[in-house]
Swiss-Prot record:
It comes from Pectobacterium atrosepticum (strain SCRI 1043 / ATCC BAA-672) (Erwinia carotovora subsp. atroseptica). Belongs to the LolA family. It is found in: Periplasm. Residues 1-21 form the signal peptide. HAMAP family: LolA (MF_00240). PANTHER family: OUTER-MEMBRANE LIPOPROTEIN CARRIER PROTEIN. The keyword Transport applies. Monomer. This is Outer-membrane lipoprotein carrier protein. GO terms for biological process: lipoprotein localization to outer membrane; lipoprotein transport. GO terms for cellular component: outer membrane-bounded periplasmic space.
Amino acid sequence: MKKWLAISCLIAGVTSTAVYADAAKDLQGRLNKVNSFHANFSQKVTSTDGAAVQEGEGELWLKRPNLFNWKTTSPDESALISDGKTLWFYNPFVEQVTATWLKDATGNTPFILITRNDTSDWNKYDVRQKGDDFELTPKSASGNLKQFAINVTTNGTIKQFTATEQDGQRSTYVLRNQQNGVVDAAQFTFTPPKGVTLDDQRQ
């Protein structure tokens, strides 16, 4: 009996690993169908008890594997831009720019996952799939991300994604009006405006 239980557990483990791998492969394949797009987004952040913490809107331009421009227009304006090497964060209100190396961006950051769509990043997660919904749980609990959920259609259109942090805070992003096609390269370049403070962490 014990031997049968051991074999059953082993089979279950192998099956579940295969299911995770298939789901991750399907997710990566869907995302690969669209290499560049522009979309509008709305953001809603809720606390552990479900209370609204913040809501916002903005625009997103993306070109895989490493180019993006995430521009928040409300409630406050800001921009997170990757030119392929440097990750720029610009906050006009405080007149400050932060520059870091994109390669140092962690793979447990949801947006970096979507942008890079790299197998080595997805391998760090157990991925479950139900139709167009994918649920990712980090294999390591060392990071701040507890769970990541994303809805992607079979043609590669991202409808929404949600990041849940270890403390229960949840950030949901809904994408609308996604337009697939060539994106102007100017969207992925950034030069700090004169007069702003530059916090250059690329040392």
